[in-house]
Amino acid sequence: MAKVLQENDKAKVCEVIKNSNLRGRGGAGFPTGKKWEAAMKQNTDQKYIICNADEGDPGAYMDRSILEGDPHSVLEGMAIAGFATGADSGFIYVRAEYPKAVATLITAIYQAKDNNLLGDNILGSGFNFNVELRLGAGAFVCGEGTALMESIEGKRGMPRNKEFRTTVKGLWGKPTVINNVETYANVAQIIEKGADWFKSIGTEKSSGTKVFALVGKINNPGLVEVPMGTKISDVVFDIGGGIPGGKKAKAVQTGGPSGGCIPTDLFDTGLDFESLKEIGSIMGSGGMVVMDEDDCMVDISRFFLEFSVDESCGKRSEEHTSELQSHQPIS
């Protein structure tokens, strides 16, 4: 943060983040630097920075771990985003079901203010940036950016029509940058070590590392941070220790309810945005659910369809009807 404020060059910060090829870790993989640059170019009286910590995919707890273990990396990333885009106000939207993360964030915000890293005139630079917490009530749909903004505004968490990008018209109709926890946690390291350092990790199009929550039928469940492009087989067998009881692996599910179940004959696929898309799955926020030979894929499909039906906002009747119809044949 000190380096950014000393150089006092918003465009340079956006350029460094663009050159690093940092992409959103919330699932979509949109280039972070392009998003910041778009918000920076908006000429308006107010802009906002939002951290999406509404982690809702079954089995995923990457954001919770970062918020509990290193909240200052997220706050610093948000403040740098605020400087780069011209925003002076930020919000962290976090699940109320994460009480330890909430308590840790509250403490971290006070610590940052006490050390002049948040608030007014940060480090004597004239830059002001404040962060507020907003607690989500557990609705999965609020993980969608515009639904999250509706919730912050005190409304029902319903996705908006995408007439404008949120960098043009977001929170309270003002330009807004929204990234997830892991994305912000990477920012300070990129500023400190440089774009080339970050690009040296991972693949050409998917730079850096990714945190995955390795859960399910696995000997060593837990959080795993690996370079983008690491093979699924390396994560499941080398890091995860394989399947309990010497049983055979059947599949790995990535991408949450909207993702896909990847069979063992595709375990040589790299964990990066492009490779997963090629085989019909997605990165998602980082949940990896391992299934063994005893798991029934019909039951797995039923579970995710039921989850999607239960958590649907119901805004588009044809969408909800389609989900229900998909669910009926396998009930």
Label each region the model flagged.
Residues V102-M228, G240:
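Hydrophobic alpha-helical positions that pack around
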Residues M1, C51-D63, T166-L171, A213-N219:
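Gly-rich Lys/Arg/Thr-decorated short loops/hinges at beta-loop-alpha junctions or inter-strand turns
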Residues L22-P31, F140-C142, K250-S258, S281, ...:
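Local cysteine-cluster metal-coordination motifs and their immediate loop/turn environment
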